[in-house]
């Protein structure tokens, strides 16, 4: 079904630009300082056009598959004041935690980044609830020596000069595949509720050296009744990871 979204004419035109001895061209030459800057900036128009193009195709994919995708997707209470901004697989854990907290009367949310570069302020603001007052940005990376991690700095820059901008703090999670659990996500939301939320924090570890970690909460399960959970132990290169991946695919393909 997705094949129809690809223009064969445009694809052929793109492939025709590949290097070929039948149509020799010179590429990669050095440019002098008198023109390099101008040439580098000339590509802005192409980057600026990407978000709208991606949004359009995401809309078409949604129509075909029924799965909704946008450059930024929001999940949670429509009038939430405290939200998390994150991207990647951790957002699934965050969404389930939001449902758990909603059952307890908590109004929180998550703004999921699907198109990171080029970063679109227009689509971010379109997805952001007007009620938001505090934001915790989660990065799965560490930039030693910087004032913050990449996504956090993007969000801070986004609100530069904006009147009544929400408070923005940042934290790190999941380095080297460290598990990110619902209890840790709850601690992030609880941090936002403080009079002075902690910035430059970590979750998932106990940092007893630089004391940047948020207080660890007792772990709890939010899986639905009837769900089977398994934990497998293996040694390096013994096939455990591959076998489990294949098993998950088989179960997924044969589960209604």
Please report, for each region that a protein language model flagged, where it lies by residue.
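Conformationally flexible catalytic loops at phosphate/diphosphate-handling active centers
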Residues: 1-74
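Peripheral docking tails and interdomain loops at the edges
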Residues: 134-222
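Anionic-ligand anchoring segments at beta-strand to alpha-helix junctions in alpha/beta enzyme folds, i.e.
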Residues: 64, 79, 83-114, 226-256
């Amino acid at each position: 079904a997705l094949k129809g979204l690809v223009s064969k004419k445009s694809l052929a035109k793109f492939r025709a630009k590949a290097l070929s001895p039948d149509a020799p061209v010179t590429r990669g030459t050095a440019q002098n300082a008198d023109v390099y800057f101008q040439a580098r900036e000339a590509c802005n128009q192409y980057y600026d056009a990407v978000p709208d193009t991606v949004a359009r195709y995401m809309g078409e994919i949604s129509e075909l598959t029924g799965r909704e995708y946008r450059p930024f997707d929001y999940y949670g209470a429509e009038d939430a004041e405290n939200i998390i901004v994150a991207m990647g697989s951790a957002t699934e854990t965050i969404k389930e935690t939001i449902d758990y907290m909603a059952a307890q009367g908590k109004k929180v949310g998550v703004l999921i980044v699907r198109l990171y570069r080029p970063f679109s302020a227009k689509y971010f603001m379109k997805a952001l609830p007007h009620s938001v007052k505090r934001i915790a940005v989660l990065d799965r990376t560490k930039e030693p020596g910087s004032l913050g991690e990449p996504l956090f700095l993007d969000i801070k820059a986004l609100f530069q000069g904006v009147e009544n901008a929400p408070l923005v703090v940042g934290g790190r999670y999941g380095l080297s595949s460290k598990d990110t659990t619902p209890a840790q996500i709850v601690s992030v939301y609880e941090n936002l509720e403080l009079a002075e939320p902690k910035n430059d924090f970590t979750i998932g570890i106990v940092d007893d050296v630089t004391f940047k970690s948020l207080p660890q909460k007792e772990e709890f399960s939010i899986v639905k009744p009837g769900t089977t959970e398994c934990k497998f132990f293996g040694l390096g290169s013994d096939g455990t990871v591959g076998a489990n991946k294949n098993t998950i695919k088989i179960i997924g393909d044969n589960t209604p």
